[in-house]
Amino acid sequence: MYGSEILSSECRKTGNFNLPVKKKRDGSYKTEPGSLVFTCFTSDFLLADADEWRKDCWQMMKQRSDCMFYFFTKRIDRLSQCLPKDWGDGYENVIVGCTVENQKAADYRLPIFLSLPIKHKTIIAAPLIEKIDISKYLSPQIEEVAASGESGMSARVCDYNWILSLRAQCIEKDVPFCFHQTGAHFLKDGKTYFVKRKYQIAQAKKAGIDYKIGADSAPEQTEEIRLAGF
């Protein structure tokens, strides 16, 4: 909807801003009912620079109640001031993922996240740059925890032991856990590996450590799923 495919810090509308409500010549939606729409995955849905456009985004989500919309944010402390008037206890078709990269971020953002009226909540431990303990935040509200390392040539190292620690916390609380991607620099068994971007998801899946991830768990972004907007 907005953001940039080139630079994630640049906030602008993309050509796909209104993709969820675009129609074909026969009047049917181009985005089929039941689709999962990943929203602002190259940016942040709650950027202040995008405030003027967000009303239209909420309206599209409401209009397309036959689709699920999923966005991540590290600005969860802005959500309450950005919600539409008819939000109530949340739109049933909107999933919100709160990102945390270290313990400081987790301890600040997650209490706010848990206090907000959201129907579907996930925690995104990404880019994971240190070992974190989120066990006290793993309430029944949390539908999934997903963990990923950092991508890019200047990416910081992600230690596999940090991933395993998060997994253990989730298992103890019976919260679904997904190891989404390794990141570019991945430390395992005392050795640091450089993993090309195109292999990071596949390498994470090879670890085989996902817990209770299935049809009822929060969806993952894949190359086959069309991004809406930004």
Task: Describe the residue ranges of each PLM region.
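Conserved Radical SAM active-site core
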Residues: M1-V94, Q103-A106, I132-S139
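Structural preference for beta-strand elements that scaffold enzyme active sites
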Residues: L36-F38, M68-Y70, N93-G97, H120-I124, ...
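Histidine/lysine/aspartate-rich catalytic loop segments that bind and position anionic ligands
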Residues: C98-A106, P111-E144, G149
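Auxiliary Fe-S-binding modules of radical SAM enzymes
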Residues: I129, S135-F230
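A general structural detector for well-ordered alpha-helical segments in enzyme core domains, enriched
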Residues: W53-M60, R109-I112, W162-L166
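Anion (oxyanion) recognition and catalysis
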Residues: K62-S65, P117, L164, I171-E172
